[in-house]
Amino acid sequence: MYNKRKIKRQTMQTSTKITGFKKLWLIFILAFMSAVAPLSTDMYLPALSRVQEAFATSEFFTQHSLASFFIAFALGQLIYGPLSDFFGRKKPLIIGIALFMSASLGCVMVDNVAHFIALRFLEALGGCAGVVIARAIVNDLFELREAAAVFALMMVVSSLAPMLSPTFGGFLLQLFSWESIFISLFLLGIALLLFVIFTLKESHEPHKESFDFKAITSRYKDVLKDRPFIIYTLSSGFALGAMFAYITGSSFVFIKYFGLHEQVYALVFGANSLGFMILSIINARLVFWCQPRTLLGLGLALMCAFSLLLMFFDSFWLFEGALFCAIACLGFIAPNAVTLAMSRFKEHSGTASAMLGTTQFTLAGIISFGVGAYGANTPWQLGLVIFACSALAAGFFFAFIKKSA
């Protein structure tokens, strides 16, 4: 239990006004922390064949290096969340970044694929600290509407990573070897570590209560018993699953079905990401005029409508227009769902953030795997998967949220 002094101290922290350059710098650092996953995966994708050749192994084993990264990234959040609640945000974050840096550098030094896969696992185990703790810090420092605006702006900045990192990774491969990608990740880790140590202030006082398995499970039970939290988490998870389905299946639809050149497809992919960024920026302003819950409901309804159209459009321009609008709706969905879920647990934001992130990542991973394994190679098939995810996200929200509030 929390005594009155602790609750008062946390209330003082959340009411502290952060404005101007300090706020922009904080958003940049938190977005940088959240961009670790796309940087670590998307920069590496162009080098998969090079790694396969370097270790004289099959594509099956190099794909396992990606799988090990995603598994560790999902499960590792469950560790850092409670740690940051008990020991403060900075110490676990510094440990995570240090582990990420060490594993990234280790990937350059190993001489067999088994060690490489193990180091990718450790790299993700360290990198996930930034994602889970960034959400907790926002929840520590900002109230509901401002938190929604901050999350939206963070997503604008961090969404640049998946847009630019494959290009940057390919550029490094042209100039150097595949090892240069992991050296770059190591250097990025150094920069992030310095930012955190010297410019990021502690936002959560460490707890004096004992840190043990019983205390951790008790917090997770509290989180799992909260129906609104579960609903917001599942809604955002299935909505992000729709985006992962699009990422996994869109290259087959646009390149093989519609016959687009790879470079044109890259432009289309970037344009769709731009739509998400634009609506995220709009959301950051609208949350001060409309309730985040209202904007979340609007985003889910619109995403359902546009994704339904995908199944009936066989023309590239019509399909792309509907897809652009559907993906853009995530700018209303993702920041508001995260804000509303996190706002349920001001006292142990880290644990809530861990459960939120792990659930989102697991759902998105399962959906992405299903699309990759069973195929969504036509506009109708991809549209069906995106609509199903959107409908589930909207269904959880509209069917249960009024009863749970």
Question: What are the residue ranges of the model-derived segments?
Answer:
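Helix-breaking motifs and short loop linkers at transmembrane-helix boundaries and internal kinks
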Residues: 56, 88, 109-115, 126, ...
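Conserved MFS/SLC helix-loop-helix module at the cytosolic interface between two early adjacent transmembrane helices
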Residues: 75-114
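Helix-to-loop junctions at the C-terminal end of transmembrane segments
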Residues: 77-88, 279-292
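Paired small-residue
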Residues: 99-106, 114-122, 317-325
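Helix-loop-helix hairpin linking two adjacent transmembrane segments in secondary transporters
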Residues: 115, 152-198
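Cytoplasmic helix-loop-helix junction between adjacent transmembrane helices
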Residues: 119-160
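Flexible cytoplasmic inter-helical loops of multi-pass small-molecule transporters
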Residues: 197-221
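A late C-terminal transmembrane helix in Major Facilitator Superfamily
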Residues: 342-380, 385-386
